[in-house]
Amino acid sequence: AHSKNVKLIMHHETSASATNYERWLDSAFKLMKEHGYDAVKTGYVGNIIPRGEHHYSQWMINHYQRVVDKAAEYKIMVNSHESVRPSGLSRTYPNWIAAEAARGTEFEAMGGNNPDHTTILPFTRFMGGPMDYTPGIFQTQYNYYDANSKNFANTTLAKQLGLYVVMYSPLQMACDLPENYERHLDAFQFIKDVAVDWDDTKILSAEPGDYIHTARKAKGSENWFVGGVTDEN
């Protein structure tokens, strides 16, 4: 990856053992710096350890803060998943570049998000800070992988592209398989071209639960990008 000028993001899936993660934070971040990693995606899937604590308890809120503090010492960016909803701390800690803290695209593989979900988040979850929604589904029919499957993602390719403008995150993901992008290189070019940070944002039209259309001016550029998402209607 380094020889091709490609940066990697390390994933620290703690399996909800927050106490164990804190014991190894220094060692983990030192390893990252030694190998050229400057960003980490943290995860907390499962029941929190210490027992009796919850993802949104005071102890865990302080834990997320401790992780970001320690990461800042090593000049490492944090993209936290399964964490508490942001409350503006990304302005104090710019290395806390994004968080999940709501139902993201991964839920399309677990029953799906309602189509209106993405028209509501900009007025709720996004008020606290950037979200790693992880858009980019190009193959929406699951029978492509399993001939007996009748499931599908509640989205369209065009909507997935619109999410890169509507859903603000300075660290964007492309969640599908490379082979699915290779079949739609024209659409994938938009993901490569779209900015991830902005100088100006204008909401062109919106109705929570129905639709939102957003225009954003790329940071340090005169280029504007326009994206929109709707519900099932």
Task: Name each region found by the language model.
Residues A71, K75, P170-A174, A195-W198, ...:
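Alpha-helix capping/termination and helix-coil
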Residues A158-E207:
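Catalytic cores of secreted or luminal carbohydrate-active enzymes
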Residues N79, D176, F225-G227:
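Short catalytic-loop micro-motif centered on adjacent basic/acidic residues
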Residues P208-N233:
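Carbohydrate-binding surface patches
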Residues A1-F152, T156:
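Aromatic- and carboxylate-enriched substrate-binding clefts and catalytic-loop regions
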Residues Y44-G46, P178-N180, T230:
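A mature extracytoplasmic/lumenal domain signature
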Residues L8, Y74-I76, N95, G129, ...:
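Structural beta-strand/beta-sheet cores of well-ordered domains, especially the beta-sheet scaffolds
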Residues S15, S83-R85, F138, L171-M173, ...:
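Short, glycine-/Ser/Thr-/acidic-enriched flexible segments
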